[in-house]
Swiss-Prot record:
It comes from the Bacteria. PANTHER family: ATP-DEPENDENT HELICASE IRC3-RELATED, TYPE I RESTRICTION ENZYME ECOKI R PROTEIN. SUPFAM superfamilies: P-loop containing nucleoside triphosphate hydrolases (SSF52540). This is Type III restriction-modification enzyme StyLTI Res subunit. Its cofactor is Mg(2+); S-adenosyl-L-methionine. The gene is res.
Length: 990
């Protein structure tokens, strides 16, 4: 079973830094003797203290607000937080993350000896018992906790409906809280909480749920969300609608455009089966709908449908006994509203079967790519589990043994599996043989009495007595690691990867490895399009639990919909672009566009000004005196609008719109490819013989050895922790607000004397070696000695917590000791890279466009010396990559270009590998050609950037010592690279 490994991502670090920079600080001016409450915050109870954090779906806001609580506790002593979410589903998602072992282990490396106590209030916790009205134990635990316990953070997790319920405001309980209070709300007021709101668009200031938050009198509110509520200002002609931010703008803004363009989420491919024109034009508009009556209109034809009446009586195309159920709902749970279009042809079973078949095909196209990962003889790339999610309209069609959907899906899936098994029985590469076994296990499970290939989760499943259904629900909701794993602890294949739901999983649940979402029903209301694709936006994790970033392995979500939603792609793009910080005005150059251009240009040229920009556009005759774009401008024989020319000359503006390749509409799923100019790459063949060799890190033996460091670190008894098991208490309770039964759940530790069984010694040792990249023979002697002599053979100390402690301690010591004490030892074999096939000993014909560059310039002028066919020109950053790629180099530069990711793969002493950004071949008259490798970095480098530069510098120094004519340069600007090239042409060493 795999373990998810959280990591610090740059955008999450930036969000955290922005929040802390916006925090108003602690008010030390007033004496405070209330140890049950948070310290006093400056500007408390005022919007000046409140903070807004805008983060797009799938970018990790749950991680950020969880870590924020740790930070505020560590730096300022704040220890009581109320986390308010809009729905029970989102509450469950937050609870699962905060209490997960992988999250606790991750945060423990930054906040030692600090634990987070999560108190969750569920429906039914206030239920009267034996005639007494008692407070929930979780509420008492939260309010009564004192700041004298300096190692514990108290978090109360509650959904909006519960916070606004009568149970929270009544004051006739038979127990008391702080100071003799008998009202939960007043008890929370006394704690002076910090409130964190998830999904703030559900909490507009004028609604009852926000008022319920205000009732507990938070000192400070921090809101996290992709969208925020609107506020109307002014009246009549002066009326305007803006986003309701506490300080009129968010303190951190990671919008949808940046999230997609920067590769922080998956790209999206949208598909729908076409309908014959006759069926496509046969559509009914919902003219009006009430609780008892539905009025449909088609042209001049009006049809009235009452409760319980069949839509097939209106049009035979409405197959499947679809009735009007009343309350603005069809019997298939489709929500209706005036103006909606219903296309009868999309309700038929044959049409839905097309979508199912397409989803299965898309699933296995993606699964093969994710499993095989380039599929070469030397294939060490970790596999990626592929999941698919189906939104359906009828539970019976899936849950019943002979349900139409279940029977159809299994029939189509068995057929596909049989075809693939036949194909792979003729293949011989190791990873292909593994995949054949995975397919065979899947088919065998599908034929068994208790198949483990697909599972469903529906709202009606809550409290079900069916053990098989409950096992499915637990796997989907709670066992994320199991769904992401390829095998269990016994080595058996984990074949479950197809999930079915209504809209129950639309929010609060996520799994990063969802690559296909198929909607077999319309979502009805005009909900956010980003929210609909949100379950599949997160970047995937591989079988080792590591997040797989776009530059490492491009990932896309296939989103399958019906013909009636074929405008989905354009609506999604519009929604994303509306979220941009700068809205591009195609009629006139406005102040926001000018500011964006000038700000970006000044990063390269500090002397660039607004006046210089306007003079340039005026000289090119792109704008008139009022800064309006001219409709037609001819330059170099080509005619475009002034706005189109502006985008070409100032591509910085394209950052304000989502890139065209991030969302594709009904196009083939083949990945975008870039063709190599083989004749130019061949000029690099001699140097590539060296680059494609495998290299081993060799550490200096001076000072402490690896054995000594391992011994010093692993002999620390404090690293060895026996893990306490937790117990989950569940009971069926009645929700006072809606009368429905729900499962209330509480988690806590078992008796202190009971500890969980540890890992098997061999497995623990192997995991430690994998995580630290240290040889087993270095770790084994000291680990075995500790277990035998100090821990008295108690294998319970071989826990996940111990493993995490040792990994962190070893990496810290090794990084500090060997940062400058290593070199590269060439090995006697080559290995394939992203651009070179070591088996064929030649460069590839084409490669994935994503690993060359995320951005595209379709109008770049071709240069025959480039490594790729142009146009289009692909790049990652406007500065300094774009000027480097567009520069007219001296004739002595015979080849140049941007290197794709993983083209060389220089090992880093911290693990992983790195590749420089650019390569140049420079011919000199009286000497051999020299090869220049360039790594571009921002002036304000991060620690990780310095590690990359150190690794590359050492690597190329090693090659030079072998008399290989290679030079390395680091640069923060294009002029610095031009200067280096001119120096090399003149025969100067870099």
């Amino acid at each position: 079973m795999m373990n998810i490994l959280l990591e610090e991502l740059p955008h999450q670090e930036q969000a955290l830094a922005a929040i802390l920079a916006s925090f108003t600080g602690i008010d030390h001016a007033q004496a405070d003797h209330n140890h049950y409450a948070n310290p006093l915050i400056k500007e408390r109870y005022d919007d000046k203290a409140n903070i807004d954090v805008k983060m797009e779906t799938g970018t990790g806001k749950t991680y950020v607000y969880t870590r924020l609580m740790y930070e505020l506790h560590q730096k300022y002593g704040l220890f009581k937080f109320v986390l308010v979410v809009p729905t029970p589903a989102i509450k469950e998602g937050a609870r699962n993350f905060i209490t997960s072992d992988y999250a606790r282990q991750h945060f423990s490396q930054f906040y030692e000896n600090t634990r987070m106590e999560l108190c969750t209030i569920n429906a039914g916790d206030f239920k009267v018992k034996s005639g007494r009205k008692n407070f929930p134990a979780q509420l008492l635990s939260f309010t009564d906790a004192s700041r004298r316990d300096s190692h514990t953070i108290q978090v109360l997790l509650i959904n909006a409906q519960m916070l606004n319920s009568a149970s929270m405001t009544r004051d006739d309980y038979d127990q008391t809280l702080l100071g003799g209070l008998t009202s939960p709300v007043k008890g929370l007021q006394m704690t002076r909480p910090v409130v964190i709101i998830d999904e703030p668009h559900r909490f507009a200031r004028d609604n009852k749920f926000y008022r319920a938050i205000q009732a507990i009198q938070p000192q400070m509110i921090v809101r996290f969300g992709a969208t925020f509520p609107d506020i109307v200002e002014g009246k009549g002609k002066n009326k305007c609608v803006r986003k309701d931010y506490y300080r009129r703008q968010p303190q951190f803004d990671l919008n949808a455009v940046d999230s997609f363009n920067d590769g922080l989420v998956k790209g999206i491919d949208i598909y729908y089966p076409n309908l014959p024109e006759e069926q496509a034009n046969n559509r009914y508009i919902v003219d009006s709908v009430t609780a008892k009556k539905l009025i449909l209109r088609r042209g001049s034809k009006i049809a009235e449908v009452g409760v319980g009446e069949n839509l097939a009586d209106v049009d035979a195309g409405f197959e499947g006994s679809i009735e009007y159920a009343g309350s603005k709902m069809l019997s298939n749970d489709l929500e209706l509203e005036a103006g909606m279009a219903l296309v009868p042809g999309t309700f038929g079973a044959s049409y839905q079967e097309l979508i199912i078949q397409d989803a299965i095909d898309k699933h296995f196209d993606t699964e093969q790519a994710n499993f095989l990962r380039s599929n070469e003889p030397e294939n060490n790339a970790p596999r990626i589990k592929t999941l698919s999610l189906f939104f359906i309209d009828s539970i019976k069609s899936y849950r019943d043994d002979e349900g139409w959907l279940k029977v159809t899906f299994e029939r189509l899936l068995k057929k596909k599996l049989t075809q693939l098994i036949d194909d792979y029985q003729r293949k011989t590469l190791p990873r292909e043989v593994e995949y054949l076994s995975f397919l065979q296990a899947t088919l065998a499970s599908l034929h068994s009495d208790n198949q483990n290939v697909h599972a469903g989760y529906f709202g009606e499943d809550r409290g079900s007595g069916d053990e098989a259904i409950q096992a499915e629900v637990d796997d989907i909701l709670k066992n994320k690691e199991k769904l992401l794993s390829f095998s269990d602890h016994h080595g058996n294949w984990e074949t479950r990867r197809f999930l079915f739901s209504k809209w129950t999983l639309r929010e609060g649940w996520d799994n990063p490895n969802v690559f296909v979402i198929a909607k077999l029903r319309s979502s009805g209301s005009e909900s956010s399009k980003i929210q609909e694709v949100g379950r599949g936006l997160r970047l995937p994790v591989d079988e080792n639990g590591h997040r797989v970033h776009q530059e490492e392995w491009p990932s896309r979500l296939s989103f399958l919909i019906g013909y009636d939603e074929k405008a989905f792609a354009s609506m999604l793009v519009d929604e994303i672009n509306r979220d941009s910080k700068v809205q591009l005005n195609e009629q006139k150059l406005d102040e926001a566009m000018i500011t964006l251009i000038v700000t970006e240009r000044q990063k390269v040229d500090p002397a660039f000004t607004e006046l210089r920009l306007l003079e340039d556009l005026d000289d090119k005759k792109l704008i008139n005196r009022s800064n309006e774009f001219k409709p037609s401008v001819t330059l170099n024989g080509e005619t475009k609008s002034g706005f189109a020319w502006l985008l070409e000359f100032y591509p910085e503006l394209t950052q304000a719109r989502v890139r065209a390749d991030r969302i594709r509409d009904n196009k083939p799923a083949s990945r975008l490819r870039v063709r190599l100019r083989k004749e130019n790459w061949e000029q690099l063949s001699s140097i590539w013989e060296q680059f494609s060799r495998r290299y081993m890190l060799q550490f200096e033996r001076s000072g402490a050895s690896l054995e000594q460091i391992a011994a010093e670190v692993l002999r620390d008894p404090a690293l060895y922790i026996r893990q306490k098991p937790s117990q989950v208490q569940q009971r069926l309770v009645s929700n006072e607000d809606n009368g429905r039964f729900e499962v209330a759940q509480r988690e806590g530790e078992l008796a202190a004397s009971e500890f969980m069984a540890g890992m098997k010694y061999g497995h623990f040792l192997k995991q430690l070696a994998l995580r630290t990249s240290l040889p087993v023979n270095v770790l084994h002697p000291v680990l075995m000695a500790m277990l035998r002599d100090v821990l008295h053979g108690d294998s319970r100390y071989l826990s996940e917590i111990s493993l995490d402690n040792m990994t962190r301690a070893l990496q810290t010591r090794i990084n500090a000791h060997f940062a400058q004490r290593h070199d590269y030892l060439p090995l006697d074999f080559q290995a394939s890279t992203s651009v070179f096939d070591s088996t064929a000993r030649q460069f590839r014909e084409e490669i994935s466009a994503e690993i060359v560059g995320k951005n595209v310039d379709e109008n770049a002028i071709d240069d025959p010396r480039s490594l790729y066919q142009i146009p289009p020109l692909r790049y990652d950053s406007v500065d300094p990559e774009l000027p480097l790629l567009k520069y007219d180099y001296p004739q002595q530069v015979s080849v140049f270009g941007k290197l794709p990711k993983r083209a060389i793969q220089i090992p880093k002493y911290t693990g992983g590998s790195t590749t420089p950004d650019f390569v140049y071949r420079i011919e000199r008259q009286d000497a051999d050609s020299v090869y220049l490798l360039v790594e571009t970095k921002a002036e304000n480098m991060r620690v990780g950037d310095q590690v990359i530069l150190d690794a590359q510098r050492k690597f190329f120094d090693m090659l030079r010592r072998q008399n290989i004519n290679v030079e390395f340069a680091e640069a923060t600007s294009a002029p610095a690279v031009f200067s280096t090239i001119n120096g090399l042409i003149e025969g100067k060493a870099n």
